[in-house]
Swiss-Prot record:
Binding site for substrate: S174
Pfam short name (any one): adh_short
The family this protein is said to belong to: Belongs to the short-chain dehydrogenases/reductases (SDR) family.
UniProt topology in membrane: Peripheral membrane protein
Stated name of the protein: Retinol dehydrogenase 13
Protein source organism: Mus musculus
Known EC number: 1.1.1.300
Subcellular location: Mitochondrion inner membrane
The entry's keywords: Acetylation, Lipid metabolism, Membrane, Mitochondrion, Mitochondrion inner membrane, NADP, Oxidoreductase
Length: 334
């Protein structure tokens, strides 16, 4: 009998350790029970994955939720699903293609005209490790969608957010930002050989730098902005990595994926927390890893890099030339 005790003990320890690791990786549910009745929320990329789950969570809490997506067919289905699950009729789909500056401006104009307020902006949409594609305006796709598109959208909606204060901006970054570097000599990957992983890391570093710089410019406005790493989730974001398309990887790495990958529902909890938690009302310019505040990479803390990136981004998206736009110029001088 005693010869079975050691194997059983080892198996029990392994199973227990696996469960604890799974719980740690998952990060848990949003600890805040706050509701947001009467508040208007915009979630980009909300037709699937983390974005859809974030929209669902905020609709459950009573928000007027706008799903801003490129694929309107999928977006309408997502909005219908959320209305059905939450019984909240104030959930709708609007077209927003972050790979098109024209589409971003059209969306912003529509929101400014039709919405009395914008209380929460969740910049969630992203592409990851795609081929060397470019946006409608010629920007490298990951830099254009993950960062530049949200940079323009946020600036165009700033006046509405300020008028709705206290309001919040949540920017989804990634742990991958720590491997990123802002190459001001070739932001658009036109001179060097394209590296899709490095391009993704650069785009996510840009998101954190944008968050830091914007928080300085928003001081005293009643608008806060924070960035977060939601965790690694099982979503369509990784469709270009090849991991989900390989039978071998699915078989060999399936247990690893199960252990270390969050469900979209759990990955949406940090965004929900930053959007609603009363204790975070005055917190701004911070980076969160899941539900916990954490120091970002050293380059993400470089104020000179952040200011330079802002100036270059404004030039690239034409903010200074957007005469008559509510977000023209640098929006809030610093």
């Amino acid at each position: 009998m005693s010869r079975f005790l050691l194997p059983v003990s080892v198996v029990g320890t392994v199973i227990g350790g696996t469960v604890l690791l799974k719980d740690y990786v998952a990060g848990g549910a949003c600890p805040s029970k706050a509701t947001i009745p009467g508040k208007t929320v915009i979630v980009t990329g909300a037709n699937t994955g983390i974005g859809k789950q974030t929209a669902l969570e905020l609709a459950k809490r009573g928000g007027n939720v706008i799903l801003a997506c490129r694929d309107m067919e999928k977006c309408e289905v997502a909005a219908k699903d959320i209305r059905g699950e939450t019984l909240n009729p104030r959930v709708r789909a609007e077209r927003l293609d972050l790979a098109s500056l024209k589409s971003i401006r059209e969306f912003a104009r529509k929101v400014i005209k039709e919405e009395e307020r914008v209380d929460i902006l969740v910049n969630n949409a992203a592409v990851m490790r795609c081929p060397h594609w470019t946006t409608e305006d010629g920007f490298e796709m990951q830099f254009g969608v993950n960062y530049l598109g949200h940079f323009l959208l946020t600036n165009l909606l700033l006046d509405k957010l300020k008028a709705s204060a206290p309001s919040r901006i949540i920017n989804l970054s990634s742990l991958a930002h720590v491997a990123g570097h802002i190459d001001f000599e070739d932001l658009n990957w036109q001179m060097k050989k394209y590296d899709t992983k490095a391009a993704y890391c650069q785009s996510k570093l840009a998101v954190v730098l944008f968050t830091k710089e914007l928080s300085h410019r928003l001081q005293g406005s009643g608008v806060t902005v924070n960035a977060l790493h939601p965790g690694v989730a099982r979503t369509e974001l990784g469709r270009h990595t090849g991991m989900h398309n390989s039978a071998f990887s699915g078989f060999m790495l399936g247990p690893f994926f199960w252990l270390l990958f969050k469900s979209p529902q759990l990955a949406a909890q940090p965004s929900t927390y930053l959007a609603v938690a009363e204790e975070l009302e005055n917190v701004s310019g911070k980076y969160f890893d899941g539900l916990r505040e954490k120091a970002p990479s050293p380059e993400a803390e470089d104020e000179e890099v952040a200011r330079r990136l802002w100036t270059e981004s404004a030039r690239l998206v034409g903010l200074a030339m957007a005469h008559g736009s509510p977000g023209r110029g640098h929006a809030i001088p610093r």
